[in-house]
Every structure is written in C-alpha cells, then in structure tokens.
C-alpha cells in the first residue's frame, strides 16, 4: 500500500524520514539504481496491439514505441521488469515515465493523459518495490523519472531563426508540474530529473517541483542527472559539467550525476569533475558502453561492472546503475561488484567562500579573484549604438556588441532593455535567446539588468546558466523585496541589491552601510539566501558636477565598501562605473582615466566587480602623471578647483587618438622581421626580394645557409610553436611551408655555387646540417593513399626536420635503403587499407633483423594505438609509436631526438603499450561469440514470399561511363571529410558543414580553405584537368547460406553453375541478452536459392583520374598546399561520383526506387533504400572480394582502375562496392569473428586459414601469435 502522499499534517516528518533514511544508507554503502527500461521493453517484442491495449484500440495515431503508455495498457509487463531489477539488486527503481509529459505525449495525441500515466507508472513501481521489500527485508525506493522532453529552451529548432524557440519556460514548468503531481500521487519516494541535455529545461523542472512543495506536497529528495554527449565534456546545449552543477545547485539535490550518451569508461573524467564541485552525493548510470555503428551496446555485464567497481574503489560514486543497453544481468553484476566498496564521502564544502556563476562555462569569484569586469555596452540606456540597433530590430548586429565585450575581457555580460519604446520582456527574451546561439558569448554568465521585474524574469527564463539579477532594493518595502528575492532564489540566480530603501537612495557612508546590512539580514535569516550570492551596489554617484554636496560621493562609496566587506561575510560589492564620470560625457579620455583611478582605490577597499566598458580601462600606472593627479584630486575631494582643472586639461590636450596601422606597415621593419612575418602569415608576394636583400647583406649573412639557419628557421619555429599551441591551423602551416620553399629555392643556386667553389679550392666539402633530424616517410607497399603522410611531412618540415618522402607503394627494402643512405633518425610508415597493417609488421621485423635501431612511427586511417602496441611494437626493440595526426608528429619526433628526454619518453611509451597489450588480451578472454551455426540460425530472416519481389534492373551485364561530367558531381560533395583532411574541426554547436564557418577558432580558416577549394574546382573542371570514369553492372543472384552466387542472364539458378561467388562474413560477437537484433551477413539481403524468387546484385567502381599527375606538378613547383588540395578534392569527387551514380541506379538503371525524391542532405543521412557496401569495410571486411568484382566486370580494362598487390585501388581517388536493392537491407559492422568462422570461410574460398587470417587480421576475435 502506498503512503499517504498528500498528508500535510506532518510534512517535515515525511521529508525528514525519506531524506534522512536515504542519507543514512548513502553514508554506509553504495546504493544501486536499476537499468534500462527501454532495453527490457524491446526484449518483449511487443506489437502495436500490445501498446494500444483495449482502451486505445481505436486511437487515431500509432502508439508502438510509446513505452510510457504500457504502464496503463500492459502494467504486468512493466511490473515484471521492475521486479527483475529489484531482485537483481537494485535499491532504487525508476518509474516508466521518461516521456510522460504532455509535451512529449503530444506526438502520440495523448497529452491529456500525462497525469494519469505518471500516477499509474508510480503505482506499478510502488507495488513492485513494496513486494520485494517484504520478500527480502531490504527497503527499496521508487524514483519518479522526469525526462528532458523533446524540446529545448536553449537551442532553436530553426537554423534560420536562432532566436526562435518552440517551447517556453512557463510551458515546461506547467508540464513538469503536471507530471510531478502524478508521480507524487502515485507514491514515489524520490524525484529524479534525468538525462538533462539542456540545463534550462532542468531549471524549469526544479521550478515546478518547488511550486508543488510550496503548495501542498511534502518535499521529496531530488536527484539530478545530466548527460554529457561526447568527449568534449559538454551537454547537448553546450554547457560543461561544472557549469551544469552550478546551474542546478539551487535545487539542493541530495544526489547529482550523469547518465546516458556515454559508457562508463568515457564517463569517468566527467564524473570526477562533478564530484569535485558538489557537496551532494554523486550518482552515475552510464550506457552499456558506446553504441556501435548500428546503435547496439556491446559492453557485457562483467565489463560494465568492472568499470563501475573501479569508480567505487577510487571513491567517485555513491549511487551506480545502468542506462541504455543495460539489463538485470548488468545490475546484478554491478551490485555484486560494489557491495563491499566504501561510498564516496562528499566534501563538507565546495569552493567555500566563492560566488559561483555560470554561462556555458563555470565562473568562480573567490578571495583571490581579480576585479571582475561586467560588460556594460549591451544596455539600451547606456549605449547609443546598442540602443539604435535594438530599436531598429537589428538584433544580429547588436549581438556583435556583446561579442566584442567578451573578447575585450568582460567576464559577465550585463543586458538591459529598459526603454519606453521597447517591449522589454520580448526584447530581453529575443536577445538572450540569440546569445544562447553564440557559444563565444554564452560561455560567460549574464547579468539580467532591469528596473522592471517582469523583464528580469523574462531574462532568467532564457538562461541555462546561473545569472546575476541587477537589481532589487528595499525601495518598495520589505514584503516586495522578499517576494522578489524569493523568486530569484527559485530561478537559481545571484543578485545585486541596491543601497536604496523606503527613504530613498543612500548617499552618505553610514546610510549605505545601514541599508545594505538590513537587506543582508533579511535575505540570509528569513530566506536562507546564500551570502555568496549577494552583491551590494552602494551607489556610485556622479562627481565633478559643480555642486558641493556631490564632492564626497566617490569617497563615501569607497569607505562604505570597506565596512560592508568587513561586516557582512560572503557579500560582494559592485557598481556602475560610468555614473562616476557622467559630468564629463563626450570626453572619453578623461572618463577612462577617472574610472581607472577610482577603481584602483575602490578595489583596494574591497570592490569585487563593476559594470564597465571592458577593454577601455587604463592601467593606473599608465595614466599620464598630470591627468592622474587631477583625477586623484577630484575623487578624493582634495581641490575645490579639480573639476575646472580637468576641463581645462581636456581642452588643451584635445581628443586625438592613435592612427590605425596600415595593412602593409610590416614592410617597414628590418628584413629579418619581414621574413618572419611573411612565413607566419603565408605571404608570398615579397619573399624573393626580401630573401635576396638578406643575401646581399654579406656582412651579416656571409653565406646563404646563414639566412636559412637564421631568420627563415626563426620564422618557421614561430609557425611550429603556434601550430602546436592550436593558434595556427594546418592550411596556414602549409601556406607557410610554401613561402619557406620559395625562399630556400631562391638560395639553393647560390649555395650550390658556394659548394662548388669550396670543392675546387679545398678538394672536399664539409657537409653542414641545419636540421633537427632526418625523417624518412613512406606509404607502405600496396597502398596508394598519401594525403595524411604528405601533411605530416609538411608540418615536420616547418619544424626544422629534413623530410625524405618516398611516396606511395614503397617496398620495405626501399624504405630501409633510404633510411641508411640518408642517415635517418626516424622512419614513419603510413597506410589506409587494412593489408597495410601486415606490411608495417613486416617492415618492423626487417628493421629488427637488420639491427636498424631507430624509432619507427606508425600512422594512417587504418592504424590504431592498440594495433601498434599489440602487433608491431613487440616485433621491434627500438621505439615504435602510433602518431594520431600531424599535430602530434612534431612533439613525438622532438622528444625522440632530444638527448635529455628520449630515454624517459621511450620508457613511458613502453609502459603504456604494455598496459594496452594486457588490456587487449584480457578483453579477448572476456569476449563471447556464438558458434557460427547458431549465428546463422539467428541471422536476419525475411518472408520472401509475402515481401514485394525484387525488381529486375534495366540491363544485365555492365555499362561503362566515360569522361563523366564533373560539374554534376559538385553538389554531391560531402565537405566534412574535406575539412578533416585539413584538421579543421569546429566545436559544438559549430560542428560539420556549413556550421564550421561559425566556429570562432577555425571558422575563418575553414572559409578560406573552402573558397580555395571552390576556386581550384572551377579551374579543374573548366580546364578539364581531371577525368572521371566508372562502371556499373547487374547480374541475377541467389544466396546460399552466407554466400551470394551470380548467374548468367539466361541461366536457371537451380540447375546452373554460378559465374561468380561473393563470400560473406556473419556477425558472431554475442549481443546483449535483451537485444532482438539479428546476426547479420550481406547474403541475408538476397533471396535464397531455395525460395524460387529471382533476385539481383549490382556492383560499381568509379575513379577520378589525373589527380596524381597534378599533385606531383604542384609539389615539384614547391606548392604543397595545392598538391594536398588537389588530392583532397580528387577524393571528394570520387565519393561524390559514387553517391550520384547510386542515386541514378535507384532511380534509372535499376529503377527499384523510380519515384525517389531525396536531397543531398537526405543522401548523407542514408535515407535512401538499399545499400552499397564495399569490400574491405565493416559489412564485408575482406579486401580479396574485390578480385571477384574486377574479374566479373573487367574493371581494369573498362575503366583503368587497377588493384595493387595489397588490393588498394589505383588511382587513390577511387570507390567501389556492391549494390543491394532489398528495401530492408542496412549497413552493419561484422565486428570480431571467431576461429570456427575463419576456418569455414577458408574452406568455402578454398584458401588456407593462414591466408584468411592475414587478410582479416583486424577483425579476428583471437590472437594468432
């Protein structure tokens, strides 16, 4: 029987009992939360009728997938799931109410049932908890789950309208209030606000709960769980973990933590951060690992339990459980793993004595924080420019004012919309919403500034961070003051209190102190307001007015500040600085000097922050001495003539300013500075003349080599340092390299002449080496991909390494010979395709055999740190290091060649790689695989007789496409991989194309590279410098078990021999016990031979020709940038060719989707029917299947695309694959396979097991060594 939830006679007792009871348990042990509800519901395989039940059998909309309705239509199913989790060891179960708000239920037309759904769900959970409590004698608790809803307050659903929102704060509060009522009436013990991807939504939920607790419901313990979406450590709306904690701490949660989106391993650093910044208990319920390529969760119960036990052993958690993909099996093992672990001990205080604010990022104001600049220019009353923009409705331009304030150093941004001609609440809402769309601005907290409390509330309802309210006062009496303060506390904001009471504005020192002291005690004693969230403004008033009574205003503020800080612990002091100098408006130099002097003294007395024009504050010591003394006299009232003297000073000094520096002013510097500037900025225009000028200075640079070793290398060192610090980007570095090559190219003839003269004179030439070291780079034998390698070469060259680039398809003996001939310090190997991994192992073995003891670097798309540590490093006794990308290569090479660092660095690498090997071998033991026979039985099943029969292609055989129109392909280019080549990656919310252009860090450079790409594309296409060729083919096909047999057009498959066979690999890694996913193989999507239904399979191969020749020409001309650009564009055109041709196949050539109407964005999201998997990729990882394609369609003869010995395609800008028309076909990853499938596959292909293991090495689920 559920407790009396609306019993108001003893609300404090109920609160105390529940909170204290849970608190007592948490102090003794780690509690366990349940696992995924959706995961378990999927296991039940419920259909539409189950979801509808009898009550909703005639409902107008489909209900399948609306899991929450099952608490009404299938309560026994939900009850049983709850009970399984409880018996598995869960102390707390969550109600089945993740989407039980009227907002989320509107999608199903059931918004009117929100209250009932919550009450029923709570009742079902309550029944299960009480039954298991009686059964086991261990008290179980029910947490009412309040999900995030499917709408967000911080992100616009419209790209074109960043200020638009499809939900309001008040609507969310109403929805959460209705949901919470149902949960409370149904008997929950805890209210859990979970899976928070937008903190503003969570703040609305907290507001709703507080409303209920104030009305009639006894308070319940509140748990809050956020969701960090990726390794950036931010929520979907862009807030950091600490920012999130600060934003919701006003809700006084008993527990706070994270769930969903990440697995335990990925979640750990963010749980650690949260634990360090909260005094609440910490809860953690991650997913069962990260979702794989197809959305499944692969982490086994034991793996997940191990991770969470590590959390517990390290004192990070108080409550653990599971989210997506987790089951009672996971919870059972987790409960067992943590049962003897000590719980985390929450700190007694977190950032004691600090004012904690947040925008997207946290901002802490502590005892040692310097003066805080609150940007003043976003104020219609204080900035004519801003007011003009807002009045004209030009909010986007007004946003630039805010951005400049932040860039100039504002740590908090004041926003004021108080003007009689404005709709204040609407203007505040629109502008705050726009700020939320700009991460560079939204990272700082806002100060919502208005004399109209309705405007203040409008602003608070838009902000996910913790704001400052500016301001309230005792002007209208205590009741009004306390009512507003109570609301501010409920919104979770700090606030400014003006020194203003019923008698008016405080101007004298004693009055300021008295008013502020009275307000402080009202807030702290009556409302329990955190003293650290109180800011007093003792009124900065105007001086220099000519009125004697105003002369002491500055002194009174400074003296009052000192006393307030000494007597009111925790409180801060702020003020509006521009008021001080209002008498001197129009004289900006005077005003700024007055502000600088005033702040110098006010800060000494304890002023913490001020509303200032960030960036326009002079340093006290930098103010002209005469002006400084005049300001001192005025502020301290030392001279009755101070105002007049300041005015006279302004008239004699004028209002001039510095001239704007002209663009080419750098040309006026010495030649060394010009050379360095040109290198850093990538400016080619003057490089030859400047290099020649330096060469002609024989006194300073007697030899051409001196110029290289001096100003040129100095410039490139700056480039390298900036790149390493993330202040320069790859395209810029490559442009710098292009300038360097031109300069060196100019000097080479002079150096060769000098060398020849020395040889004639002395008979020999002493070689001099200005480089840090020599590095041999090569793409290994059989592989033709080299963009990444070339970029690494350029970056290393920019950092004073000599790079010997051997190109592509480089055999081992050539690599080793070059290393010996050039006395290389390091060898770097690159590869894109999986067979290249074996070639890298071979090179390492040969280096060991020949006793070549120099470091070996491994890189390329197919490589990984794990493969390097497990498969390559053990074969070679010198350092073997995996290098992720160009930006890491310089650091690695520098440490390997530093005599003082290299030994220690190598030891660290050896230890790290040994740990990786141990983890790898342990994971092999933990992985479980279905026997192949069982995996086949659990494969994807289709009712071929009832499904629509396969469509016959418009032709059988092949069709070749010569000289394909490149212009048609431009719109199909996917630009994201293009930017990846240049290592340009935007941060949330500016990831991907075209949003990357908005990114503050890389956006400008991305736009330049994109423009360069389009210019080059236009040239390549208009001048026909590239050619595209391809082939498409179709044949009758039938599946037999895991293989696909192809037949001649006239053949009867049941009686004929196949003309070709494509061999398939099937998923074997055991899936979660709750998963209903089949174990896929590509053959599942082709009609079986025994079905009697005729099916078809297609194939294609396309390529862009001429890329290598153009790239080489650019390289020979010293233009690395264009060399890399043309290769990147060649790859994009080839992929675009594959995309466009597949569209034609679906609509015309095979015509199984003749009416398809998809745009390019839809194609990228894979919204088309059918698939085009490629051999060597996840759905069929075996590259040898290409041999069958090439033979069947005579691809090399018809297109010129050939296969290397490692089965890479040449040219490198090529794509090939198979076409499946089955409307239910999907992309999947085969994943790891076990030995029985390898043996079976070898037998079917009639090759040795060893040969199969060679080609399938990366997906083997066992160790072959």
Swiss-Prot record:
It comes from Homo sapiens (Human). Its cofactor is methylcob(III)alamin; Zn(2+). GO terms for molecular function: cobalamin binding; methionine synthase activity; zinc ion binding. Modular enzyme with four functionally distinct domains. The isolated Hcy-binding domain catalyzes methyl transfer from free methylcobalamin to homocysteine. The Hcy-binding domain in association with the pterin-binding domain catalyzes the methylation of cob(I)alamin by methyltetrahydrofolate and the methylation of homocysteine. The B12-binding domain binds the cofactor. The AdoMet activation domain binds S-adenosyl-L-methionine. Under aerobic conditions cob(I)alamin can be converted to inactive cob(II)alamin. Coiled coil: none annotated. Widely expressed. Expressed at the highest levels in pancreas, heart, brain, skeletal muscle and placenta. Expressed at lower levels in lung, liver and kidney. It is an enzyme of class 2 (transferase). Monomer. Dimer. Forms a multiprotein complex with MMACHC, MMADHC and MTRR. Residues 371-632 form the Pterin-binding domain. It catalyses: (6S)-5-methyl-5,6,7,8-tetrahydrofolate + L-homocysteine = (6S)-5,6,7,8-tetrahydrofolate + L-methionine. S-adenosyl-L-methionine binds at residues 974, 1172, 1227-1228. Residues 19-338 form the Hcy-binding domain. Changing residue 1071 to N: Decreases binding to MTRR. Zn(2+) binds at residues 260, 323-324. It comes from the Eukaryota. One of its GO terms (biological process) is methionine biosynthetic process. Residues 772-907 form the B12-binding domain. Its main location: cytoplasm. Catalyzes the transfer of a methyl group from methylcob(III)alamin (MeCbl) to homocysteine, yielding enzyme-bound cob(I)alamin and methionine in the cytosol. MeCbl is an active form of cobalamin (vitamin B12) used as a cofactor for methionine biosynthesis. Cob(I)alamin form is regenerated to MeCbl by a transfer of a methyl group from 5-methyltetrahydrofolate. SUPFAM superfamilies: Cobalamin (vitamin B12)-binding domain (SSF52242), Dihydropteroate synthetase-like (SSF51717), Homocysteine S-methyltransferase (SSF82282), Methionine synthase activation domain-like (SSF56507), Methionine synthase domain (SSF47644). Pathway: Amino-acid biosynthesis; L-methionine biosynthesis via de novo pathway; L-methionine from L-homocysteine (MetH route): step 1/1. This is Methionine synthase. Residues 923-1265 form the AdoMet activation domain.
């Amino acid at each position: 029987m559920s407790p009396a939830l609306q019993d108001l006679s003893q609300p404090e007792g109920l609160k105390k009992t529940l909170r204290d009871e849970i608190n007592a348990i948490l102090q003794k042990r780690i509690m366990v939360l349940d696992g995924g509800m959706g995961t378990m519901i999927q296991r039940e395989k419920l259909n539409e009728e189950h979801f509808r039940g009898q009550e909703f059998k005639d409902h107008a909309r489909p209900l399948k997938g609306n899991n929450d309705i099952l608490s009404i239509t299938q309560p026994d199913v939900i009850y049983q799931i709850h009970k399984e989790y409880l018996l598995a060891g869960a102390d707390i179960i969550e109600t089945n109410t993740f989407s039980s708000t009227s907002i989320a239920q509107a999608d199903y037309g059931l918004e009117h049932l929100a209250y009932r759904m919550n009450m029923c769900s709570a009742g079902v959970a309550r029944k299960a908890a009480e039954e298991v409590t009686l059964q086991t004698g261990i008290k179980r608790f029910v947490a009412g789950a309040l999900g995030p809803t499917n709408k967000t307050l911080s992100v616009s659903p419209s790209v074109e309208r960043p200020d638009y929102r499809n939900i309001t704060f008040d609507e969310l509060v109403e929805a959460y209030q209705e949901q919470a009522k149902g949960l409370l009436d149904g008997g929950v013990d805890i209210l859990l606000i979970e899976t928070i991807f937008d903190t503003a939504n969570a703040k609305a939920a907290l507001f709703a709960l507080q409303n209920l607790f104030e009305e009639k419901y006894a308070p319940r313990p509140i748990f809050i769980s956020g969701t960090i979406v990726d390794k950036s450590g931010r929520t979907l709306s862009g807030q950091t973990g600490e920012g999130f904690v600060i934003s919701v701490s006003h809700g006084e949660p008993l527990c706070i933590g994270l769930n969903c989106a990440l697995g335990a391993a990925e979640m750990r650093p963010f749980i650690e951060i949260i634990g360090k910044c909260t005094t609440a208990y910490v809860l953690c319920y991650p997913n069962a690992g990260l979702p794989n390529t197809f959305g499944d969760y692969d982490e086994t119960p034991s793996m997940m339990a191990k991770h969470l036990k590590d959390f517990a052993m390290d004192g990070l958690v108080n409550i653990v459980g599971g989210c997506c993909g987790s089951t009672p099996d996971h919870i059972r093992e987790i409960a067992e793993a943590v049962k003897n672990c000590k719980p985390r001990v929450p700190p007694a205080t977190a950032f004691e004595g600090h004012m904690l604010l947040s925008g997207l990022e946290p901002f802490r104001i502590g005892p040692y924080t310097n003066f805080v600049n609150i940007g003043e220019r976003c104020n219609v009353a204080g900035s004519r420019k801003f007011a003009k923009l807002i009045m004209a409705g030009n909010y986007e331009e007004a946003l630039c004012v805010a951005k400049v304030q932040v860039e100039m150093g504002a740590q908090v941004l004041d926003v004021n919309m108080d003007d009689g001609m404005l709709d204040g609440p609407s203007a505040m809402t629109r502008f705050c919403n726009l700020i939320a769309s700009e991460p560079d601005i939204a990272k700082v907290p806002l100060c919502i500034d208005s004399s109209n409390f309705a405007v203040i509330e409008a602003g608070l309802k838009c902000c996910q961070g913790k704001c400052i309210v500016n301001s309230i006062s005792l002007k209208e009496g205590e009741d009004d003051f306390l009512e507003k303060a109570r609301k501010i506390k409920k919104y979770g904001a700090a606030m400014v209190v003006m020194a203003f009471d019923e008698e008016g504005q405080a101007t004298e020192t004693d009055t300021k102190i008295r008013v502020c002291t009275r307000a402080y005690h009202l807030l702290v004693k009556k409302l329990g307001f955190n003293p650290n969230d109180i800011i007093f403004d003792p009124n900065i008033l105007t001086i220099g007015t000519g009125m004697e009574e105003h002369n002491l205003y500055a002194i009174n503020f400074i003296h009052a500040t000192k006393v307030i800080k000494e007597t009111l612990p925790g409180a801060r002091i702020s003020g509006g600085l521009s008021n001080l100098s209002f008498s001197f408006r129009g004289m900006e130099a005077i005003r700024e000097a007055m502000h600088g002097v005033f702040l110098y003294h006010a800060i000494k007395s304890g002023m913490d922050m001020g509303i200032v024009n960030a960036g326009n504050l002079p340093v006290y010591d930098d103010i002209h001495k005469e002006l400084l003394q005049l300001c001192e006299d005025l502020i301290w009232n030392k001279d009755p003539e101070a105002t007049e003297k300041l005015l006279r000073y302004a008239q004699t000094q004028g209002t001039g300013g510095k001239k704007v520096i002209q663009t080419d002013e750098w040309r006026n510097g010495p030649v060394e500075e010009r050379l360095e500037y040109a290198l850093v900025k990538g400016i080619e225009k003057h490089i030859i003349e400047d290099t020649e000028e330096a060469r002609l200075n024989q006194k300073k640079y007697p030899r051409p080599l001196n110029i290289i070793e001096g100003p040129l290398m100095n410039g490139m060192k700056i480039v390298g340092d900036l790149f390493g610090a993330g202040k320069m980007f790859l395209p810029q570095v490559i442009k710098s390299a292009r300038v360097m090559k031109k300069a060196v190219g100019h000097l080479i003839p002079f150096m060769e002449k000098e060398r020849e003269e020395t040889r004639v004179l002395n008979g020999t030439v002493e070689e001099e080496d200005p480089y840090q070291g020599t590095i041999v780079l090569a793409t290994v034998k059989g592989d033709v991909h080299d963009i990444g390698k070339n970029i690494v070469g350029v970056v290393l060259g920019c950092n004073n390494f000599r790079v010997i680039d051997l190109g592509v398809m480089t055999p081992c003996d050539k690599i080793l010979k070059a290393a010996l001939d050039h006395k290389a310090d390091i060898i770097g190997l690159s590869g894109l395709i999986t067979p290249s991994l074996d070639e890298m192992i071979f090179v390492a073995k040969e280096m060991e055999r020949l006793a070549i003891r120099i470091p070996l670097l491994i890189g390329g798309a197919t490589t990984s740190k794990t493969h390097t540590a497990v498969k390559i490093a053990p074969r070679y006794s010198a350092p073997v290091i995996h290098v992720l990308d160009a930006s890491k290569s310089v650091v690695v090479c520098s440490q390997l060649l530093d005599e003082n660092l290299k030994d220690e660095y190598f030891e660290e690498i050896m230890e790290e790689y040994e740990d990786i090997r141990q983890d790898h071998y342990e994971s092999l033991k933990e992985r479980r695989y279905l026997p192949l026979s069982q995996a086949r039985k659990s494969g994807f099943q289709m009712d071929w007789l009832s499904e629509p029969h396969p469509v016959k292609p418009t032709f059988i055989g092949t069709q070749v496409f010569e000289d394909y129109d490149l212009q048609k392909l431009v719109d199909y280019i996917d630009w994201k991989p293009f930017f990846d080549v240049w290592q340009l990656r935007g941060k949330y919310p500016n990831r991907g194309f075209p949003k990357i252009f908005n990114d503050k860090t890389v956006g400008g450079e991305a736009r330049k590279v994109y423009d360069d790409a389009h210019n080059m594309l236009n040239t390549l296409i208009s001048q026909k410098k590239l050619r595209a060729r391809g082939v498409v083919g179709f044949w009758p096909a039938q599946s037999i078990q895991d293989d696909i047999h192809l037949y001649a057009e006239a053949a009867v498959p049941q009686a004929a021999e196949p003309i070709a066979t494509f061999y398939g690999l099937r998923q074997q890694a055991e899936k979660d016990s709750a998963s209903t996913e089949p174990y896929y193989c590509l053959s599942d999507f082709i009609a079986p031979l025994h079905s009697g239904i005729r099916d078809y399979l297609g194939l294609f191969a396309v390529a862009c020709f001429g890329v290598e020749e153009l790239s080489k020409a650019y390289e020979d001309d010293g233009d690395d940038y264009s060399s890399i650009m043309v290769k990147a564009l060649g790859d994009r055109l080839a992929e675009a060719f594959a995309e466009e041709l597949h569209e034609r196949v679906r609509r015309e050539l095979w015509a199984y989707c003749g009416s398809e109407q998809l745009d390019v964005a839809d194609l990228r999201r894979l919204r088309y029917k059918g698939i085009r998997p490629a051999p060597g990729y996840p759905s069929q990882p075996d590259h040898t299947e290409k041999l069958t394609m090439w033979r069947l369609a005579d691809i090399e003869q018809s297109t010129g695309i050939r296969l290397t010995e490692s089965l890479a395609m040449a040219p490198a800008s090529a794509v090939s694959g198979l076409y499946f028309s089955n409307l239910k076909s999907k992309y999947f990853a085969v994943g790891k396979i076990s030995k029985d499938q390898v043996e079976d596959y070898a037998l079917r292909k009639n090759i040795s097991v060893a040969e199969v293991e060679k080609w399938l090495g990366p997906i083997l689920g066992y160790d072959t060594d």
